[in-house]
Amino acid sequence: GAAPDKPTLIFMHHPPFETGIWWMDSLGILDGLDRLATVLGRHRQVVGMTAGHLHRTIHATFAGVPVTVAPTTCYAVDLDIHDEALPKVTDEPSAMMLHYWHVDTLVSHTLFLDAHETYDVTGLMKDWPGRFERMRQRQPMPKALGSIE
């Protein structure tokens, strides 16, 4: 509340919503969510929330605020949203999120940590130097120049 005009992020361990993974939800902070929603309603400068606990990427909203749940850096909680689902983990790839504030927008990227190849596609494009300059200047890309040939 000390800086109501400054965009603010909230980081917390447990997500402020039910995920559908009952056995993880039962370990969360489901009590008091109405009070948290009231606080967020008074603080419109909160532009995003990030949580963990679930070991899997989830996107939702709570009280009108976008919420991301960070992916796993070790094992992932198995995505099984049936009421009788047994608690399980899986060996999905490890990942992390990078949150980037750009002008007036929160941008969140997910980066997989396992080794993977990258490929330079500039050799497949006509007039790469011209395209590069247009992109750097944030100019619209004519459709004929926007495709890979």
Per-region residue spans from a language model:
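His/acidic metal-ligating clusters that form di-metal
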Residues: 1-68, 128, 132-143
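Binuclear metal-dependent phosphoesterase catalytic core
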Residues: 58-149
